[in-house]
């Protein structure tokens, strides 16, 4: 287990100007004031995110944040379609609340959590993390959430539990990517972690970003964030978390085991068959090709905190 110890954090309200460029924050505030008049008439859309309060923490990187519009409109969420713009374009009908999250398996006290109650009760934190996609692009995102370990400890896991299995949602009526004759993946989306990975301080369940609740397009109402792994490990719209004894199946590994490993640790020395992992393109900075690419860091820059989890492992074989 890593010896990573974050410095003490202070309690503060995470306002938009704390993480958003000032001009954008001011425009948003003016817009929200105007929206208040619309809301009074009942015409406001439920798609507008609610503000969240969170603690500022030492979990941050000295890098420019990816613009909020890019984070919310350029991502992979195949339940809504395979194009990068599909999640934002096709998720308007998705209903993230009410939402139940079951935590079960090899535990003494299986529980079903109401996500709205979790958001109200858990000590939410802002975590500014790098996010690296296996497609060789990256972002820097100010997530809001809480350590996964703080939820898992509530169900009293048994000693026989070695892995954590995650299950996503199946709602073809609300998720057009789950309909049709030819499906990109088998549903539900499933993922997994070793127990020590799940309990690591860097691993969080996110319920928001940029000071607001998660947009549907980014995995509302609750998703996994593991910053040293490729983005496909970050399962969205989670419905179940189970303690299991054996390594659980994962969606992309099941789809193409030669391309997507179970561990999926960011590793510039191990290429994907279709994408070199040596460099990456930071979304929101420069053009698509050329000199704006930057070197990819082992474990996405979190090696000091997590490399000890894989001591003695062949990271090329266990990709």
UniProtKB/Swiss-Prot annotation:
Alphabetized SUPFAM superfamilies for the sequence: Oxidoreductase molybdopterin-binding domain
Signal peptide: 1-54
Record's GO cellular component terms: periplasmic space
Compartment list: Periplasm
Main location: periplasm
Disulfide bridge map: none
GO terms, molecular function: metal ion binding; molybdopterin cofactor binding; oxidoreductase activity, acting on a sulfur group of donors, quinone or similar compound as acceptor
Catalyzed reactions: L-methionyl-[protein] + a quinone + H2O = L-methionyl-(S)-S-oxide-[protein] + a quinol; L-methionyl-[protein] + a quinone + H2O = L-methionyl-(R)-S-oxide-[protein] + a quinol
Pfam families in alphabetical order: Oxidored_molyb
Protein task: Part of the MsrPQ system that repairs oxidized periplasmic proteins containing methionine sulfoxide residues (Met-O), using respiratory chain electrons. Thus protects these proteins from oxidative-stress damage caused by reactive species of oxygen and chlorine generated by the host defense mechanisms. MsrPQ is essential for the maintenance of envelope integrity under bleach stress, rescuing a wide series of structurally unrelated periplasmic proteins from methionine oxidation.
Subunit note: Heterodimer of a catalytic subunit (MsrP) and a heme-binding subunit (MsrQ).
Protein's UniProt name: Protein-methionine-sulfoxide reductase catalytic subunit MsrP
Name of the gene this protein is made from: msrP
């Amino acid at each position: 287990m890593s010896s990573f110890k974050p410095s003490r954090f202070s309690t503060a309200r995470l306002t938009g100007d704390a993480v958003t460029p000032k001009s954008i924050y001011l425009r948003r505030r003016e817009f929200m004031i105007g929206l208040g008049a619309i809301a009074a008439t009942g015409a406001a859309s439920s798609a507008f995110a609610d503000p969240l309060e969170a603690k500022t923490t030492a979990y941050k990187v000295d890098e420019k944040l990816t613009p909020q519009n890019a984070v919310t409109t350029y991502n992979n969420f195949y339940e809504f379609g395979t194009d990068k713009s599909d999640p934002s374009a096709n998720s308007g009908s998705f209903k993230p609340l009410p939402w139940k999250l079951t935590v079960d398996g090899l535990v003494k006290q299986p529980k079903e959590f109401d996500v709205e109650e979790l958001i109200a009760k858990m000590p939410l934190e802002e975590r500014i993390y790098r996010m690296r996609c296996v497609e060789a692009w990256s972002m820097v995102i100010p997530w809001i959430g809480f350590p996964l370990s703080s939820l898992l400890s509530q169900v009293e896991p048994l000693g026989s539990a070695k892995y954590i299995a995650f299950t996503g949602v199946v709602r073809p009526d609300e998720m057009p990517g789950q309909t049709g004759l030819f499906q990109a993946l088998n549903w539900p989306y499933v993922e997994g972690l070793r127990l020590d990975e799940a309990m690591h301080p860097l691993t969080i369940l996110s319920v928001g970003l940029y000071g607001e609740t998660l947009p549907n397009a980014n995995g509302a109402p609750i998703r996994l964030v593991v910053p040293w792994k490729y983005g496909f490990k970050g399962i969205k719209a989670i419905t179940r978390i189970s303690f299991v004894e054996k390594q659980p199946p994962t969606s992309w590994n099941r789809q193409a085991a030669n391309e997507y490993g179970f561990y999926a640790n960011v590793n510039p020395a191990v290429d994907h068959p279709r994408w070199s992992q040596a460099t990456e393109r930071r979304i929101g900075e420069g053009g698509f090709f050329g000199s704006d690419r930057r070197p990819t860091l082992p474990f996405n820059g979190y090696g000091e905190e997590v490399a000890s989890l894989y001591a003695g492992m062949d990271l090329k074989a266990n990709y």
